[in-house]
Amino acid sequence: MRGARGAALALLAGIVFSAGAFAHSFLEGAEPRPGSTVKTVPAEVRLRFTERLEAAFSTVLVTDESGKRVDRGEAHLEAGAPKRLRVPLLSVGPGRYTVKWRVLSVDSHVVEGEFTFRLAP
């Protein structure tokens, strides 16, 4: 009985303590906010994720309504914040913009997604 109880406790501990290792990184927040309308031209798009990211394998692409790329292509992690990804924007005018991301979290899982925001000064 004692051996079965110990095995059950070991199994339970393994499940509980390894749960973090299987957590994928999901978008937790963004600026501009998904679906929002902003009145001032943002200098950059900032994305906040639930898990640490691998910068070398994480990308952000921002396009206008015609599909033209309007980011500077320099997505990088925020200094001291391994869950925050930033990409500077070119000078943009009024319209709808699409933000697409593809990130690799430290658990080695790739997650991607997109959202839009509108600029209406």
Model segments located where?
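A glycine-anchored, Pro-Gly-centered beta-turn/N-cap motif
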Residues: 93-102
